[in-house]
C-alpha cells in the first residue's frame, strides 16, 4: 500500500494550490513576525488523551500573506490518533481529506515522517494581520504532563522559482513558547494521579533533616568499599610513583606504565619502576601481584588492597583492573584537601558488569563529552559503556570502508539532520533539530582514542547495533550511495510502527543485504579496535525483528509462488515464526563468533519467543542447548533483562531466572535504572515518564535491590515487591553478572539536560552496583495464604528494615551533596542536579518563614519582591503581600544551584496535600467496604465478592510503599462485570478538587472541523474534570467479560486508551524498550491487581453511570449497540 493523497475534484485542486507555493515575502518577514504559543489544555479529552491548543500570532509590523509559506514542527505523539489503522498499521490523517486534517482558522495539517508535521495556510483566506491571532486544536494520542514533551525550533519555508528559504520561528528557539502546566487538567495522567502534582516548597520542607558532617564525608568513598578503616592522621602523596608487575607480557607492562604515568603527571610526582633491591618509600607503590588471594568473589581481577602509613601509600592487586580501582579510591580519599588518611581498605565489586547505555544516536553529545563521561565512570568504578552506533534518528560513527567507500553515506548523511525532504544530504529534521545541519559523529581517530582512554580506565566500550527495528539512521543514507547494497525495498508492504509511523525503519531479516551489512559493520569495528590495540570482545544487539514486515515481505517466501501458495506459505511462516526468529538469532551470534567476538549481548526480546499456537509466550526463553544437549549458540550469550511489564498475564519480570536457568548470563536493567525518567514530577524540568512511573527520585534509586528478583517491579503491591506466586527465584545466582543503567536522549536537547538527569543518580547507581548493603536482604516477596475458616486470602507483607535503610541513605546522599557534587563541578566541569529548598509558614502573630534543604553544606537563598538574594536563610520575616522566591546554592560554587521556586504565602494545603487526602479517603472507604464484606459469608458464585485487604501502615504519598488501594484510587479500573446493585456503597465518589476554571471547551467551529458535535452536559456526569461538553452518556456495559475493552469513562467516543506499562520507555533500540504508547481498549497492569476486583467507587464516572442506570436514566445496550455509539470493538493487544 502506498501513501495516498487525493488528486481529484475540488479537494485535489485545493491541495495542488497549497503545494505550489510561491514566495510572497522574505522568510525572515514570516519567522520574525510569527509567535507560537502551545498549551496542553487537558489530558482527558474525547477520542484522545490530550487536548492541545496552538496559537499563531502576528507580532510583526507587516501582514503575513494567506499563502506562499508553510511551517514544520515535531510532535512525538501521534496527532489525531483515530486516523491510525491499527489492524493495517497505517497512519492517515484524513478525517476530511486524504492525509490531511483541516484545522480551524484556515490551516491544513499533514504528517511528514518520524515526529514531523506540517501546517499550511489554506489559500484565499484572509492574511494574518498585525496583532491578529489564529488558533487551532490538536488531539494527541497520550497524556502530556511536561514541557519536554514539546520540541523547540518550529520552522517555516517559502518557495520561489524552485528556491527554498527556511527559517526558525524566533520564539520557538527554546521551550518558552510552551505555556505552564497549572492545574489537574494537565498535571494528571489519569484521574486521582496525585503523584504527578508538582511539589511546592511546603511539600519539600523537612524540619528534622539530619545533615552529614565534614568528618563523616571527608574520607567517605563512593561506591562504599567492602572493608575500610581510616584515621584522622594524614599524609601527602610523597615524591614518587613506584610501579611493578609480575606480568611478563609486553602489553601488560606497557599498560601498567601508562596507568602509573597518568597518576604521576596528575600529582606532579616522579616515576620509577620497581626492580630487585630498590628501596620503596615516601611515595605511592603500585604493584600487580598476580596473586589471587580470594577467588570466590564475583570479579577477582578488580579486587585491590590499599594501605596508607607514614612511610608509603601502597596499592596491591592481582590484576591491573584492581590496581586502577585502587587509584580511583585514593583520588576519592584525597578529594577534600589533597591528603590521605592513615589506614587500610580491602575492596572488590559485587558484580563484574557495571554499565551505562548512553544514547548518543538520538542526540549526539560530541567527542569531548563522551571522553569526559569516561573519566566520571572511572571515578565511580563503572566499567562498561554501551554506545549505540545508530537508531532511527542518526548514525554516529565514521567507518573505514575504503577503497570502495560502500558505506560512506552512513555518517555523511546519517550523522546530521536538516530540512531535506528527499533526504539526499541529511536525515530529515527530527526531535527539534531545526532546518539547519545539526548533529555529528565520531571520526575513526576519535573512536580509536576513546577506546584507548577507556582501556586505561578499566572500561570496555561496547557498540550496540539494531539489526531489526529502529534502524532508520542506517537504512536511509544507503539509498543515496551508488556503491552500497540497499537495506530498504520500496516494494515492501507499507506496514509501519504506530509509534514511529514510517516504514523504512526496520531491516528485513530475509534479505541477504541485512546479513552483509551486519558482517561488514563487525569487520569495520574490529579494524577500529585493532587500531587502538584493544580486542573487540563484546557486541550488543539492540532491537528485535519486525514480524509484520517479515510476514508481508516477498523476500521471506519463494519467488515462484502463486497467490494461493503464497497465502499458505504465510500461514506456515506465521505458525513457525518462533523457529524463524531462533534461526535468525543463531545467524547473528554465529556471524559475531566468525569475526572473533566472544560474547553477544542482546535485549531480552531477542532471546525469547512470541505468542503462538503452541503455547509459547514472551516468557518462553530459547534454550542455549539443543535437544541433543549440544551448544545452540557458539558464543557466550548475555541477556539484558529490562522488560518488567505484563503482557497478557505474562509477568515478564520472571524472564531473568529463566535466562539464568537456561545458561545465559543476565544483566539487570529494570525501569528503575532508566535515567531518562524525571527526578521529580516537575513539568518545567527535563525527564520522561510513563503510565506507571512519573519520576525516579534519589531515594527510590537508592533502594534498588539487585539480588531480590521479586522486587524492583514498578507499582507492585508494596515497596515494589510482588507476591511470591508472581515471581520465581530458581535461577543460578552466579548467572547474574551485573547491572545496566540507561539514558534515552530523545527529549534531551542540551548537555545541561543530560547532566541534570545523570548526576548524581549515576553515583547512586554505582553505589548499588558495587556495594551490597546489609539491609538489602530484608527486601523480598510477599506471601499469600488462605484462612481455612473464612476462606479469605491473607497477604503477609514483607517489611524491609527501614531504620537501617534511612540511616545509610542519609549518609550516602548527604556525602554526595557535601563532597561529590563539588568533585563533579571542580574536576569534571559537570553541573549535577540540585534539589530545590523547602519552606513553610510558622504560626504566631507575625508572618515568618522557616526554610530548609536536603542538600548538605548548601544554603537556602531568598529574594523578596525582586530584591538581591539573602544568603543562608533559615528564618525569614515577610508580609502577606510579598513575593518570595527561594533557591538552593552552594556557598563556594554559586553556579551550583537549584531552580528558583516561588513560595505561596498561604496556610492552605498545597495541591499535592489535597490530592493525597483524596487517596487517603479512598483508602479509608475501600477498607470500610472490605471490613463489611469480611463479615459476610463466602459466596464463591458471586463474582462481586472479594476478600478484604489487610491494613498496612504506610503513607500513600511515600513511593517506598505504594498500596493496593491507593494505586486503585489513582488508576480507576473498568466496571466489574455483573456487579449486583445491592453491593454498591451508597456514598459519593472521591472527586479531586475542581480546578478554579471551567473545563477547556472547543469552539463549535473547531468541533465541527474535528468531526465532533457539541453535546449536552448530562446531570450527574461531573468528574475530576467537571462537566464535559460534547459528551454523551456511555451505554451500559454488558454482563460478562469485554472483548479487549477497558470500560469507557462515562462518555461516548472514549476508547479506553491508556499508555503502556513501565519498562516500555520512549526509545526504540535501548535495551528491552519500545516506545511507550496507547493501545486502545487497554488498562495498564499492576501486579496483584485484577482490574475487575475493585469497586467502581474508585472511578467516579463508573459510579455515576451505575447510579444513573439504576434510576433508569441510561438504557442498557448490547456490545454492538455500544460500538455504534462510538465504542468500537478492538481486539486485545499486547501491552
Curated annotation (Swiss-Prot):
GO annotation terms (biological process): carbohydrate metabolic process; chitin catabolic process; glycosaminoglycan metabolic process
InterPro entries found in the cross-reference section? Beta_hexosaminidase_sua/sub (IPR025705), CBM2/CBM3_carb-bd_dom_sf (IPR008965), CBM2_carb-bd_dom_sf (IPR012291), CHB/HEX_N_dom (IPR004866), Glyco_hydro_20_cat (IPR015883), Glycoside_hydrolase_SF (IPR017853), Hex-like_dom2 (IPR029018)
State where composition is biased (Low complexity).
Answer: 1004-1026, 1043-1073
Record-linked Pfam families: CHB_HEX, Glyco_hydro_20
UniProt KW Hydrolase keyword: yes
The record's subcellular location field reads:
Secreted
The pathway noted for it is:
Glycan degradation; chitin degradation
This protein's major location comes to secreted
Q: Where is the composition biased (Pro residues)?
A: 986-1003
Which intervals of the chain are annotated as region Disordered? 970-1082, 1107-1135
State which Enzyme Commission number(s) the record gives: 3.2.1.52
Pull one GO CC term from this UniProt entry: extracellular region
| Secretion signal, residue range per the UniProt entry | 1-23
Reaction(s) catalysed by this chain, per the record, are:
Hydrolysis of terminal non-reducing N-acetyl-D-hexosamine residues in N-acetyl-beta-D-hexosaminides
GO molecular function terms noted in the UniProt entry:
beta-N-acetylhexosaminidase activity; polysaccharide binding
Gene3D superfamilies xrefs: 2.60.40.290, Chitobiase/beta-hexosaminidase domain 2-like, Glycosidases
Tissue pattern of expression reads:
Prismatic layer of shell (at protein level). Expressed primarily in the mantle with highest level in the mantle edge and lower level in the mantle pallium.
The superkingdom of the source organism is: Eukaryota
Q: What class of enzyme is it?
A: hydrolase
Q: Which UniProt keywords apply?
A: Hydrolase, Secreted, Signal
What family does this chain come from, according to its entry?
Answer: Belongs to the glycosyl hydrolase 20 family.
Instruction: State the name under which the record lists this protein.
Output: Putative beta-hexosaminidase
Specify the species. Answer: Margaritifera margaritifera
Amino acid at each position: 500500500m502506498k501513501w495516498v493523497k487525493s488528486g481529484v475534484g475540488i479537494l485535489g485542486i485545493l491541495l495542488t494550490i497549497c503545494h505550489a507555493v510561491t514566495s510572497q515575502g522574505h522568510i525572515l518577514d514570516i519567522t520574525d513576525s510569527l509567535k507560537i504559543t502551545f498549551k496542553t489544555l487537558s489530558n482527558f479529552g474525547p477520542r484522545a488523551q490530550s487536548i492541545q491548543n496552538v496559537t499563531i500570532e502576528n507580532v510583526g509590523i507587516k501582514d503575513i500573506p494567506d499563502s506562499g509559506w508553510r511551517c514544520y514542527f515535531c510532535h512525538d505523539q501521534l496527532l489525531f490518533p483515530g486516523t491510525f489503522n491499527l489492524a493495517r498499521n497505517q497512519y492517515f490523517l484524513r478525517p476530511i481529506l486524504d492525509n490531511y486534517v483541516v484545522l480551524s482558522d484556515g490551516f491544513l495539517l499533514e504528517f511528514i515522517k518520524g515526529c514531523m508535521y506540517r501546517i499550511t495556510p489554506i489559500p484565499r483566506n484572509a492574511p494574518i494581520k498585525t496583532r491578529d491571532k489564529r488558533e487551532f486544536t490538536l488531539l494527541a494520542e497520550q497524556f502530556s504532563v511536561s514541557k519536554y514533551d514539546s520540541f523547540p525550533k518550529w520552522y517555516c519555508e517559502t518557495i520561489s522559482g524552485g528556491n527554498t528559504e527556511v527559517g526558525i520561528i524566533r520564539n520557538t528557539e527554546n521551550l518558552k513558547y510552551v505555556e505552564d502546566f497549572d492545574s489537574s487538567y494537565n498535571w494528571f495522567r489519569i484521574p486521582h494521579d496525585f503523584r504527578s502534582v508538582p511539589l511546592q516548597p511546603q511539600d519539600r520542607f523537612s524540619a528534622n533533616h539530619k545533615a552529614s558532617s565534614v568528618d563523616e564525608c571527608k574520607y567517605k568513598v563512593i561506591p562504599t568499599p567492602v572493608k575500610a578503616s581510616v584515621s584522622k592522621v594524614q599524609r601527602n602523596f610523597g615524591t614518587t610513583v613506584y610501579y611493578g608487575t609480575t606480568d611478563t607480557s609486553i602489553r601488560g607492562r606497557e599498560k601498567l606504565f601508562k596507568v602509573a604515568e597518568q597518576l604521576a603527571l596528575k600529582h606532579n610526582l616522579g616515576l620509577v619502576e620497581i626492580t630487585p633491591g630498590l628501596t620503596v618509600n615516601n611515595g605511592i607503590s603500585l604493584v600487580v601481584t598476580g596473586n589471587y588471594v580470594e577467588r570466590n568473589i564475583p570479579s577477582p581481577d578488580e579486587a585491590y588492597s590499599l594501605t596508607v602509613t607514614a612511610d608509603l601509600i601502597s596499592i596491591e592487586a592481582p590484576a591491573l583492573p584492581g590496581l586502577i580501582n585502587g587509584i580511583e579510591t585514593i583520588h576519592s580519599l584525597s578529594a577534600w584537601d589533597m591528603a590521605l588518611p592513615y589506614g587500610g581498605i580491602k575492596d572488590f565489586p559485587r558484580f563484574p558488569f557495571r554499565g551505562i547505555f548512553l544514547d548518543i544516536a538520538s542526540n549526539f553529545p560530541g567527542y569531548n563529552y563522551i571522553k569526559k563521561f569516561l573519566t566520571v565512570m572511572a571515578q565511580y568504578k563503572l566499567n562498561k559503556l554501551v554506545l549505540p552506533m545508530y537508531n532511527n534518528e542518526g548514525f554516529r560513527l565514521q567507518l573505514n570502508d575504503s577503497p570502495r567507500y560502500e558505506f560512506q553515506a552512513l555518517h555523511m548523511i546519517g550523522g546530521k539532520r536538516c530540512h531535506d525532504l528527499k533526504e539526499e544530504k541529511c536525515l530529515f529534521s527530527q526531535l527539534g533539530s531545526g532546518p539547519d545541519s545539526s548533529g555529528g559523529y565520531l571520526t575513526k581517530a576519535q573512536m580509536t582514542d576513546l577506546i584507548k582512554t577507556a582501556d586505561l580506565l578499566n572500561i570496555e566500550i561496547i557498540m550496540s547495533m539494531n539489526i531489526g527495528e529502529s534502524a532508520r539512521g542506517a537504512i536511509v543514507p544507503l539509498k543515496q550511495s551508488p556503491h552500497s547494497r540497499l537495506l530498504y525495498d520500496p516494494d515492501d508492504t507499507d506496514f509501519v510502527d504506530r509509534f514511529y509511523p514510517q516504514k523504512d525503519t526496520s531491516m528485513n531479516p530475509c534479505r541477504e543485504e541485512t546479513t552483509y551489512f551486519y558482517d561488514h559493520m563487525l569487520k569495520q569495528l574490529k579494524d577500529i579496535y585493532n587500531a587502538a590495540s584493544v580486542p573487540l570482545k563484546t557486541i550488543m544487539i539492540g532491537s528485535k525483528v519486525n514480524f509484520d514486515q517479515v510476514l508481508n515481505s516477498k523476500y521471506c517466501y519463494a519467488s515462484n509462488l502463486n497467490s494461493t501458495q503464497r497465502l499458505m506459505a504465510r500461514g506456515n511462516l506465521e505458525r513457525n515464526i518462533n523457529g524463524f526468529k531462533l534461526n535468525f538469532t543463531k545467524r547473528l551470534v554465529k556471524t559475531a563468533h566468525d569475526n572473533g567476538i566472544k560474547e553477544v549481548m542482546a535485549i531480552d526480546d531477542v532471546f525469547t519467543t512470541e505468542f503462538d499456537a503452541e503455547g509459547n509466550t514472551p516468557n518462553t526463553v530459547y534454550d542455549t542447548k539443543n535437544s541433543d544437549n549440544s551448544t545452540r549458540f557458539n558464543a557466550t550469550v548475555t541477556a539484558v533483562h529490562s522488560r518488567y511489564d505484563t503482557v497478557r498475564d505474562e509477568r515478564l519480570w520472571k524472564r531473568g531466572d529463566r535466562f539464568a536457568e537456561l545458561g545465559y548470563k543476565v544483566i539487570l536493567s529494570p525501569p528503575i535504572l532508566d535515567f531518562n525518567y524525571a527526578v521529580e514530577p516537575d513539568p518545567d524540568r527535563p525527564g520522561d515518564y510513563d503510565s506507571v512511573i512519573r519520576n525516579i527520585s534519589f531515594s527510590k534509586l537508592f533502594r534498588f535491590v539487585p539480588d531480590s528478583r521479586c522486587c524492583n517491579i514498578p507499582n507492585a503491591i508494596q515497596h515494589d515487591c510482588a507476591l511470591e506466586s508472581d515471581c520465581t527465584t530458581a535461577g543460578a545466582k552466579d548467572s547474574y553478572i551485573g547491572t545496566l543503567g540507561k539514558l534515552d536522549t530523545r527529549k534531551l536537547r542540551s548537555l545541561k539536560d543530560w547532566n541534570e538527569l545523570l548526576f548524581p543518580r549515576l553515583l547512586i547507581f554505582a553505589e548499588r552496583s558495587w556495594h551490597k548493603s546489609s539491609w538489602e536482604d530484608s527486601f523480598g516477596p510477599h506471601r499469600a495464604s488462605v484462612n481455612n475458616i473464612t476462606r479469605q486470602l491473607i497477604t503477609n507483607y514483607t517489611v524491609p528494615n527501614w531504620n537501617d535503610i534511612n540511616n545509610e541513605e542519609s549518609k550516602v546522599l548527604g556525602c554526595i551533596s557535601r563532597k561529590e557534587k563539588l568533585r563533579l563541578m571542580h574536576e569534571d566541569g559537570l553541573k549535577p542536579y540540585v534539589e530545590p529548598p523547602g519552606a513553610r509558614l510558622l504560626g504566631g502573630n507575625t508572618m515568618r518563614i522557616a526554610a530548609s534543604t536536603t542538600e548538605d553544606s548548601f544554603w537556602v537563598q531568598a529574594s523578596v519582591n525582586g530584591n538581591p538574594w539573602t544568603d543562608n536563610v533559615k528564618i525569614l520575616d515577610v508580609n502577606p503581600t510579598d513575593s518570595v522566591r527561594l533557591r538552593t546554592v552552594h556557598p563556594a560554587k554559586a553556579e551550583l544551584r537549584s531552580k528558583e521556586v516561588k513560595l505561596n504565602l498561604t496556610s492552605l494545603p498545597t495541591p499535592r496535600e489535597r490530592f493525597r487526602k483524596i487517596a487517603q479517603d479512598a483508602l479509608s472507604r475501600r477498607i470500610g467496604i472490605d471490613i463489611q464484606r469480611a463479615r459476610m459469608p463466602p459466596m464463591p458464585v458471586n463474582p462481586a465478592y472479594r476478600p478484604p485487604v489487610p491494613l498496612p501502615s504506610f503513607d500513600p504519598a511515600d513511593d517506598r510503599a505504594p498500596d493496593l488501594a491507593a494505586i486503585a484510587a489513582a488508576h480507576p479500573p473498568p466496571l466489574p462485570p455483573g456487579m449486583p446493585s445491592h453491593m454498591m456503597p451508597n456514598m459519593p465518589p472521591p472527586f479531586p478538587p475542581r480546578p478554579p476554571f471551567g473545563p477547556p471547551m472547543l469552539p463549535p467551529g473547531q468541533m465541527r472541523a474535528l468531526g465532533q458535535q457539541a453535546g449536552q452536559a448530562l446531570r450527574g456526569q461531573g468528574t475530576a474534570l467537571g462537566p464535559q461538553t460534547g459528551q454523551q452518556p456511555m451505554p451500559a456495559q454488558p454482563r460478562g467479560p469485554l472483548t479487549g475493552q477497558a470500560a469507557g469513562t462515562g462518555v461516548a467516543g472514549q476508547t479506553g486508551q491508556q499508555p503502556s506499562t513501565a519498562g516500555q520507555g520512549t526509545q526504540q533500540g535501548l535495551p528491552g524498550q519500545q516506545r511507550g504508547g496507547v493501545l486502545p481498549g487497554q488498562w495498564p497492569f499492576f501486579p496483584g491487581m485484577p482490574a475487575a476486583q475493585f469497586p467502581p467507587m474508585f472511578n467516579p464516572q463508573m459510579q455515576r453511570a451505575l447510579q444513573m442506570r439504576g434510576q433508569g436514566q441510561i438504557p442498557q445496550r448490547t456490545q454492538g449497540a455500544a460500538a455504534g455509539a462510538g465504542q468500537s470493538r478492538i481486539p486485545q493487544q499486547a501491552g
